[in-house]
Amino acid sequence: MNFVLILMTNTLLALLLMIITFWLPQLNSYMEKSNPYECGFDPMSPARVPFSMKFFLVAITFLLFDLEIALLLPLPWALQTANLPLMVMSSLLLITILALSLAYEWLQKGLDWAE
């Protein structure tokens, strides 16, 4: 009963905060407010410069490899399982996929900054 009460309270509080943020938007946007601020001087360069596609691809690759490493973190606790061969095979499969994807990125020159 306490769990349901806590869950309902948190849900209602989250919904209330979401409704308040939609009802009270910042509508007074003007040119001076949307310009970048550099210590009171006029900006030296535009603030909305697009970043390179190479950086974006490296960032996405990092996120994917980080996710795969996070999947490997519970392996020490998984060694205590009753079905050890299945756990070893699945971990070897995951490590193989990680190594093959790294080799593919390397061969496609996805990790090289110089062109």
Swiss-Prot record:
Q: Which reaction does it catalyse?
A: a ubiquinone + NADH + 5 H(+)(in) = a ubiquinol + NAD(+) + 4 H(+)(out)
**Keyword line:** Electron transport, Membrane, Mitochondrion, Mitochondrion inner membrane, NAD, Respiratory chain, Translocase, Transmembrane, Transmembrane helix, Transport, Ubiquinone
Membrane topology per the entry is: Multi-pass membrane protein
Localization, UniProt: Mitochondrion inner membrane
What are the protein's GO molecular function terms?
Answer: NADH dehydrogenase (ubiquinone) activity
Whether Transmembrane counts among this entry's keywords is: yes
InterPro entries, alphabetically? Answer: NADH_UbQ/plastoQ_OxRdtase_su3, NDAH_ubi_oxred_su3_sf
List the residue ranges forming a coiled coil, or say none: none
Q: Which GO terms describe its biological process?
A: mitochondrial electron transport, NADH to ubiquinone
- What is the top-level taxon of the source organism? Eukaryota
One Pfam family linked to the record: Oxidored_q4
Annotated TM spans: 3-23, 55-75, 84-104
Q: Name one GO cellular component term.
A: mitochondrial inner membrane
> Where is it mainly found?
mitochondrion
Q: What is its EC number?
A: 7.1.1.2
Spell out the subunit comment. Answer: Core subunit of respiratory chain NADH dehydrogenase (Complex I) which is composed of 45 different subunits. Interacts with TMEM186. Interacts with TMEM242.
Its family?
Answer: Belongs to the complex I subunit 3 family.
Question: What is its biological role?
Answer: Core subunit of the mitochondrial membrane respiratory chain NADH dehydrogenase (Complex I) which catalyzes electron transfer from NADH through the respiratory chain, using ubiquinone as an electron acceptor. Essential for the catalytic activity of complex I.
Q: What is the protein named? A: NADH-ubiquinone oxidoreductase chain 3
Please give the organism. Pan paniscus
The gene for this chain is MT-ND3
